[in-house]
Regions:
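A C-terminal functional module that forms or caps the active site or interfaces directly
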Residues: 232-284
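Nucleotidyltransferase catalytic core that binds NTPs
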Residues: 1-241, 249, 253, 280
């Protein structure tokens, strides 16, 4: 696997290494890679290996995007592990990993604000309501990344389901011929969704954070998920979670109206000073 300090040297390499432009399979990340990211890269590798005779190239980017953090402390405390990230990416099957700089991504300087994005409930509810401007930053950086990489396929995890839906809408609107490939959530043995933020939880806190997933499953299996979500949120609060939302909405549009077979449970809560999010499909 090759490592590049930015997209310009990576693109120069591609132009010299391939007689025919390869189909690019892209896994954008913010680093602090874990087994869930490994699943994304392995999914891209498997997809590439099934593409037949066309040349392919699996590339991972690692860039901590300052415009999508609504709290400075969250940004400054985000873990950085570049050497370990490169090893994991290589082991999972990446052909290249790119570490773009803030200057490359924002040559005019990091903007104090970015253009607002309005995709209805996709951007205005749940994370969009609790973290105003968050998806503006996500869309800005993903648009920037896609313009630089121009992948045929981009791989994103279902743990950040709402972000996945927003990015799918962005690609549909602005990038013809590009496809988003969802990858299922990887979980720890306890059921806790894998996240780089989990590193900030001590042993017992990390173990007990699994109550979040248990609450989701309880709601999803209920005969009345929307009513059960209220009780589950109260029970999480009694355990010490600071619940921001626990809601049942349509997984495609994020609208609240009940549609059998199309509902999903979403939760965001603080635990041990760390903000955790997760989601599962309703099971009936």
């Amino acid at each position: 696997m090759l490592s590049f300090s930015g997209f310009e040297p990576w693109r120069t390499y591609l132009n010299g290494a391939f007689m025919q432009a390869p189909d690019i399979l892209f896994v954008p990340t913010m680093g602090a890679l874990h087994a869930g990211h490994g699943d994304l890269i392995r999914a891209a590798r498997k997809w590439a290996d099934g593409c037949g005779v066309r040349p392919t190239h699996v590339v991972v980017s690692i860039f901590i995007n300052p415009t999508q953090f609504d709290e400075e402390s969250d940004f400054s405390s985000y873990p950085t592990t570049p050497e370990e990230d490169a090893v994991l990416a290589a082991d999972a099957g990446a052909d290249a990993v790119v570490f773009p700089s803030v200057i490359e991504m924002y040559p005019q300087g990091v903007p104090s604000s970015v253009d607002p994005v309005h995709y209805g409930a996709l951007t205005d509810t749940l994370e969009g309501a609790k973290r105003p401007g968050h998806f503006d930053g996500v869309v800005a950086v993903v648009r920037n990344l896609m313009e630089k990489v121009r992948p045929r396929w981009a791989f994103f995890g279902e743990k950040d389901w709402q972000q996945l839906a927003v990015i799918q809408r962005l690609i549909e609107f602005e990038f013809e011929g590009m496809e988003v490939v969802p990858v299922p959530t990887r979980r720890e043995q306890s059921g806790l969704a894998m996240s780089s933020r989990n590193q900030r939880l001590s042993g017992s806190l990390r173990r007990d954070a699994a109550a979040l997933y248990a609450a989701l499953i309880r709601v999803a299996k209920s005969t009345d998920p929307q009513a059960e979500s209220l009780q589950a949120a109260a029970d999480l609060e009694s355990l010490g979670f600071e619940v921001e939302y626990l809601e049942v909405v349509q997984e495609g549009s994020l609208e609240p109206e009940w549609v059998p077979g199309e509902m999903r449970v979403f939760v965001a809560a603080r635990w041990g000073g760390v903000r955790l999010i997760d989601n599962v499909s309703c099971l009936q």
